């Protein structure tokens, strides 16, 4: 029996993006200055021309993803869950959900702590969910 290698879900996400990138040339990945934490950096190394770092601007990232989708791209917008659901809510609702735009949102770090990837005071965690 082979032993299963245990890895973080976010690492699986980064690896899955690379596999999808092999299959779909129109796939692009966006992140909000979190390529290391969300593991989109794995995709960035494999396909640097199809990765966009939007900086610490989640709302803007969602708008960019929506725009890219209208040109035939399949964008994966990736950030911490708190910022995808909180900071970028209006853009997700108005620019992606209402017009039914084909944007995939990858939200990591959805628990009550972001561990080694965030401030100890919890600004990047999803404590409201508790």
Please describe what each predicted stretch is.
Residues 1-127:
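Thiamine diphosphate
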